[in-house]
Amino acid sequence: MAALDGSFGYEMEIITHPDSGISTIEDIRGKQLAFSSPTSNSGFKAPSAILKADYDMVAERDFEPAFSGKHDNTILGVANKDYMAGAIANKVAVRMIARGVIKKEQIISIFKSQTFPTTGYGVVHNLKPELQTKIRNAFFNFNWEGTSLQKEFEKGNEGQFIEMTYLSL
């Protein structure tokens, strides 16, 4: 997904609630940090790598990890003070605030990563070219107007698919 101006991506943020006493990454030591799931980039892999590389912090040794199941649960858990802190994809929080699920004042960001590319869709190399074209056209010619997808993604200022490519080495 991309914004109408062509910008795309999201950042991993580590959030906390205003009463947590946490204002820096180092303040998480000895406390609980919620992750979404072990397979999530922004909900586990990126924060784990950043915490280890930049802060010498490792789960179990320096903080207690918890898995909420998904970004929404982590955000709700932090906002409702069930978790002291959590690692999230910030676009999810933006949409939850826009829907009125939480109030912006319920969470504070103490860390924001570089921008990561959003989810990519692709086709296998040996798929018939005609079918590859049809799949591509389904994405790029999708009529957003009036759909539930438009309603949801415009809250995060997103509203189009963009072409992505890769670098051959």
Mark where each language-model region is.
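Short beta-strand elements of ligand-binding domains
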Residues: M1-A2
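Bilobed "Venus flytrap"/periplasmic-binding protein-like clamshell domains
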Residues: D5-L76, K91, G159
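Periplasmic-binding protein-like
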Residues: D5-T16, S40-S42, V101-R136, F139-L169
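Short amphipathic alpha-helices in soluble, non-transmembrane regions
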Residues: D27-R29, I135-F139
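Second-shell loop/turn segments in exported
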Residues: A34-S40, A79-Y83, G122-V124, E158-E163
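A ligand-binding cleft/hinge motif common to bilobed small-molecule-binding domains
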Residues: P47-A53, G77-N80, M84-K104
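Surface-exposed interaction patches
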Residues: N73, N80-M84, K91-V92, G122, ...
